[in-house]
Regions:
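Gly/Pro- and small hydrophobic-enriched strand-loop and loop-to-helix capping segments
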Residues: 123-146, 180-195
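Conserved CoA-thioester-binding segment of acyl-CoA-metabolizing enzymes
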Residues: 1-52
Length: 218
């Protein structure tokens, strides 16, 4: 499956499992993510959600390279109505993450671009590593910074958001924190341990999960 979801302890865990495509989001993946998040939003036993992307080397290393451009190009050139479904449902997913009402912890290791920003920027704990490569490259393919970019890029200090939007430039984890596009830094080799601990700790409530994660930032 391209989206792996399980509940361990009091936390719902999502792994994007399409490493060959750097976890680019297909329509099926968007639908899987919507389904599981709506389910967990209603489930009182799930206090928080954590999400990561499988990389070629293992459980972390590539968060999400964005929307599946190959699919979008093919759908667009053949008049496939699924292209509209993709954007409509992807944007609904982005909005859901912003309004989830529970801590949403994004392990933004490796590539975090375009649609990958859309499924992380609405989170309450946006964690970057020394391997993070972040960008909103939509203008390069003649689109605009979508997936909520108008919201999160406008909240960068000064004119940084405008610069990121117009150039599509890639920034690292430290710059992401400075630009208000990430909340904390974690060395990549520490992620697996924290991910495991999220599923074994006892938490009083969602706020306690959020507090635990923030205590792990370097």
């Amino acid at each position: 499956a391209e989206v792996l979801a399980e509940v361990r302890g009091q936390v719902g865990f999502i792994t994007l499992n399409r490493a060959k495509a750097l976890n680019a989001l297909s329509l099926g993946m968007v639908r899987d993510l919507l389904d599981v998040l709506l389910q967990w939003q209603k489930d009182e036993k799930v206090l928080a959600v954590a999400i990561r992307g499988n990389g070629k080397e293992g459980a972390f290393g590539a968060f999400c390279a964005g929307g599946d451009i190959r699919f979008l190009h093919k759908a667009g050139s053949t008049g496939n109505p699924e292209i509209e479904d993709f954007f409509t449902e992807e944007y609904a997913l982005n909005h859901l993450i912003h309004t989830l009402g529970k801590p949403y912890i994004a392990f933004m290791d490796g590539i975090v671009m375009g649609g990958g920003m859309g499924i992380s920027q609405g989170g309450t704990a946006r964690i970057v590593t020394e391997r993070t490569k972040m960008a909103m490259p939509e203008t390069i393919i003649g689109l605009f910074p979508d997936v909520g970019g108008g919201y999160f890029l406008s909240r960068c200090p000064g004119r940084v958001g405008e610069w990121l939007a117009l150039t599509g430039d890639t920034i690292n984890g430290a710059s992401a924190i400075a630009a208000n596009l990430a909340d904390g830094f974690m060395p990549s080799d520490k992620q697996a341990g924290v991910w495991e601990q999220l599923g074994t700790e006892k938490f009083a409530d969602g706020a306690a999960v959020q507090k635990f994660i923030e205590s792990q930032y370097v």
